[in-house]
């Protein structure tokens, strides 16, 4: 998969591709990337890429011309273009799985008040919001999307990890609690079931704790889970 990021500040993005698991994925040939600086496509002598908003209002808007030139520069026939914006559709793990099947993802990083709507109308396949909050940097949102997608690609991480983690393909629940050494930390001991060696009991404990956490922290996901399994198996009676 190739990630192409169009940004006013590509230097924010670059280090992510040079470290940790992403670096290994690139070395394996699983991932490639291109960073495009919108300023390189500005015809303004000062390389400005923003202007005042028609109709008035606070803040500046990214201009259509340099953004259009930057997008036309991308040489890909099977690209999916995404603009990250608080006004977009809600980003979910399900959408991350869908995007992980694409060949190339082009990400437009917003700044200021956003970009000229005509760029969205002409070029964007998905306008996506990573949450109900506002960032000053579209680059941060881009990194969230990139990280959530590339880790789903074959050969990046252990596929079993994807089944057990929060929002995983297995059941959609939040992940169960984890413990490691030491056994006793500040008077709190690891639950006995986890050191019992009884794999079936451990499996049942983890499912119970995952359901418990999901019900407490994300009741909306808990209700979806109940719809999937068709019943609550008496879980509510235990709490």
Curated annotation (Swiss-Prot):
GO terms for molecular function: tRNA (guanine(37)-N1)-methyltransferase activity. It is an enzyme of class 2 (transferase). Signal peptide: none annotated. It catalyses: guanosine(37) in tRNA + S-adenosyl-L-methionine = N(1)-methylguanosine(37) in tRNA + S-adenosyl-L-homocysteine + H(+). One of its GO terms (cellular component) is cytosol. SUPFAM superfamilies: alpha/beta knot. Transmembrane segments: none annotated. S-adenosyl-L-methionine binds at residues 110, 130-135. Its main location: cytoplasm. It holds the Pfam family tRNA_m1G_MT. InterPro entries: Alpha/beta_knot_MTases (IPR029028), tRNA_m1G_MeTrfase_C_sf (IPR023148), tRNA_m1G_MeTrfase_TrmD (IPR002649), tRNA_m1G_MTases_N (IPR029026), tRNA_MeTrfase_TRMD/TRM10 (IPR016009). It is found in: Cytoplasm. CDD domains: TrmD-like (cd18080). Its EC number is 2.1.1.228. Keywords: Cytoplasm, Methyltransferase, S-adenosyl-L-methionine, Transferase, tRNA processing. GO terms for biological process: tRNA N1-guanine methylation. Specifically methylates guanosine-37 in various tRNAs. Homodimer. Belongs to the RNA methyltransferase TrmD family. PANTHER family: TRNA (GUANINE-N(1)-)-METHYLTRANSFERASE (PTHR46417:SF1). This is tRNA (guanine-N(1)-)-methyltransferase. It comes from Borrelia garinii subsp. bavariensis (strain ATCC BAA-2496 / DSM 23469 / PBi). The gene is trmD.
